Amino acid sequence: MGERLRRHGAACVMDEVAAADSEALILVDEADREVGHLSKTECHDGQGVLHRAFSLLIFNNEGELLLQQRSRQKRLWPMYWSNSCCSHPRRAENMETAIHRRLYEELGLRCPLHFLFKFQYQAQFESAGSEQELCSVFIGRSNAAVKVDSNEIHALRWAHPEALQAELAGSGADKFTPWFKLEWARVWREHRAAVLALQ
């Protein structure tokens, strides 16, 4: 299949404290208007409560996408492969500040980030809870060394988009988070030119 998937072997580990479950997330309506705040734990209980989130897709100079395998300590989708970084703005924090803050906290990276689109989804993970997010998707490019927050990430790998498409079209799709599969399908379908322009 000509896969160029490979584990990221040069990452060094940073022992940063993972986002507290009591941290207040921003509740929104379907138009992304702020309607209140609720703890991270409560947002993920049951069917979930709609809240503001973001997803970052980081590519290298070869056009490969950085994928992370979520920590086994995660309440939702532990050990699943997902996008480069995803999180939530803090209470009273704007999106621009939040995306750059979290990219550095989780991966030790700083790079320009470009907005692509927003999408809303709801997904339940067994009996552990659910995600229900209005998620803004951004892309960026970096060839810098990655510094991993081991509380958030179990492993990293770089994937060429063509190989990733093949993996997602097969039985390997079950190893990926639901939000990543949704957003990547749209990136591949509607925003491939923007990804290629990063190279």
Which ranges hold each PLM region?
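A glycine-rich, hydrophobic loop/mini-helix early in the fold
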Residues: 53-88
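The catalytic Nudix box helix
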Residues: 66-67, 82-116, 138
